[in-house]
Amino acid sequence: ETVHHVGFLVSKKGAIRGKHFHKEQKQYTLVQKGKIKVTIKNLEDKNSIVESKELNKMDMVLFPPYVYHSIEAVEDSECLIFTSKSRKGSGYEDDTFRVENINSFEL
């Protein structure tokens, strides 16, 4: 798989990032420092439930297309973000769909 963007995400304890999904791109997140809690839901599966998991240093997670994801910093954290689509210009916003309340959201 080709990586078209690498980002560096720095979050203070308690910060919640993401709360969105992508229709086209895959996103890999690698914890470099600290601890995070990822919350996901497969939006293409009507029977999918909201799931959460804590990740530590050097853990990696893949968010495929149509998987809602949020990242909460359990501790001050640093993550590398790798995506399969460029985020130059409007590349990020063009494929980012925000979700305020995942518990009531449907496609």
Predicted regions and their residues:
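A short glycine-rich, His/Asp/Glu-containing loop-to-beta-strand
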Residues: 1-19
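Tight coil/turn sites that cap or link beta-strands
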Residues: 12-14, 57-58, 64-66, 76
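Short beta-strand His + acidic residue motifs that chelate non-heme Fe in jelly-roll/DSBH
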Residues: 19, 38-39, 63, 69-74, ...
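His/acidic/aromatic-lined binding-pocket segments of jelly-roll/cupin-type domains
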Residues: 20, 26-31, 53, 61, ...
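Short acidic-glycine-tyrosine-enriched beta hairpin
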Residues: 43-65
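Double-stranded beta-helix
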Residues: 74-107
